[in-house]
Curated annotation (Swiss-Prot):
GO biological process: protoporphyrinogen IX biosynthetic process
Family stated for the protein in its record: Belongs to the uroporphyrinogen decarboxylase family.
GO molecular function, one term: uroporphyrinogen decarboxylase activity
Protein purpose: Catalyzes the decarboxylation of four acetate groups of uroporphyrinogen-III to yield coproporphyrinogen-III.
Highest taxon, organism lineage: Bacteria
UniProt-annotated binding residues for substrate: 23-27, 73, 149, 204, 321
HAMAP family: URO_D
Coiled-coil zones: none
Pathway: Porphyrin-containing compound metabolism; protoporphyrin-IX biosynthesis; coproporphyrinogen-III from 5-aminolevulinate: step 4/4
EC identifiers of the protein: 4.1.1.37
Location(s), subcellular: Cytoplasm
Protein name: Uroporphyrinogen decarboxylase
Length: 344
């Protein structure tokens, strides 16, 4: 197995950084769209281990990447807890009966029953890990991010229902977050048992919170998960809070091994605020792939020059969030080739 990705979490400074891409198995690839067309709905595809493996392999077959990520969705846990999940074209994920009260919370399945409904994810991990020669990344949504969808019923611009519960009924909010955290620990451990070499916690909506509430309602539960997972098996764990650059000083002392960085700050700024010891992952603006070949190469060169100038810390080159569906696959090749060229 090529271990450059895992080596980034070691103490030795690497000669070149590993690279992978958030949502690297996705709609920007025509081969992905061909597989997706075979299924009536997205979750049916996620439940098919062979399909998950096939689409996870697509980017590895096209590009020189150092890691794969299991093909799944962050909302598998809420669905396993008994919530009715549908993916609606033009809207995205929708829960028909959002969590609004303690009564709604009481309707959810137990942790044991919920975990038993997620075997299809572990099967996808096992099938994919046996088919690749690079590390496989397992993942989950943070409890706060899962709760955001469970309470709102869908994505939102302002998350008023979510934030209302946080302020008006914090006890209920913490009850939901704790249950999600307890399930997530088992969920990640099962992914590791099935073949994941590291795990990532996507805190997509943590960035909407004020600092103190981020600490109490998001970071607290990510840290709880990381500590409990590491008590069982010491694997690399990456925290990624989208829009979370204001929280780096809080994250730097937590149990994660790496921190995802979006494009709102430079890697130099992120390193200054996080300090030494954590791997930084990121942080290209996904939209930079709309640019010309020359502009892509220039942007890559600047980041690689900084990475190589830091003699103490390792970096994982990635986008600052998921790749956009309408990105030209050839632009991704330009990016990766430039990363390899300027890292040589």
């Amino acid at each position: 197995m090529r271990k450059l990705f895992l080596d980034a979490f070691g103490e030795k400074k690497l000669d070149k950084p590993p690279v992978w891409i958030m949502r690297q198995a996705g709609r920007y690839l025509p081969e992905y769209r061909a597989v997706r067309a075979k299924f009536d709905n997205f979750m049916d595809m996620c439940r098919n281990a062979d399909a998950c493996c096939e689409v996870a392999l697509h980017p590895l077959q096209r590009y020189d990447l150092d890691a794969a990520i299991v093909f799944s969705d962050i909302l598998t846990i809420p669905e396993a807890m008994g919530m009715d999940l549908k993916f609606i074209k033009g809207t995205g994920p929708v829960f028909s009966e959002p969590i609004q009260s303690q009564k709604d919370l009481d309707k959810l399945k137990s942790i044991e029953d919920s975990i038993g409904s997620l075997d299809y994810v572990y099967n996808a991990v096992k099938t994919t890990s046996s088919a690749i020669n690079v590390p496989l990344i397992g993942f989950t949504g943070s409890p706060w991010t899962l709760a955001a969808y469970m309470i709102e019923g869908s994505g939102s611009k302002q998350f008023n229902k979510l934030r209302k519960m946080m302020y008006a009924n914090p006890q209920l909010m913490h009850s939901l977050l704790q249950r999600l955290a307890d399930i997530t620990i088992i969920y990640l451990l099962e992914q590791v048992k099935a073949g994941a070499s590291s795990v990532m916690i996507f805190d997509t909506w943590g960035g909407i919170l004020p600092l103190e509430h981020y600490k109490n309602f998001s970071l607290k539960y990510m840290e709880y998960i990381a500590k409990n997972v590491k008590q069982k098996i010491n694997i690399p764990i990456v925290f990624f809070t989208k829009g979370g650059s204001n929280f780096f000083e809080e994250i730097k002392d937590k149990s994660c091994d790496g921190v995802g960085v979006d494009w709102s700050v430079t890697l130099k700024q992120a390193r200054h605020r996080i300090g030494v010891g954590k791997v930084l992952q990121g942080n290209f603006d996904p939209a930079f792939l709309y640019g010309s070949k020359q502009s892509i190469r220039e942007t890559v060169r600047a980041n690689i020059e900084f990475i190589q100038s830091d003699k103490l810390n390792n970096y994982i080159v990635n986008l600052g969030h998921g790749i956009y569906p309408d990105i030209d696959p050839d632009s991704v090749r330009v990016m990766i080739d430039a990363i390899r060229e300027f890292s040589a």
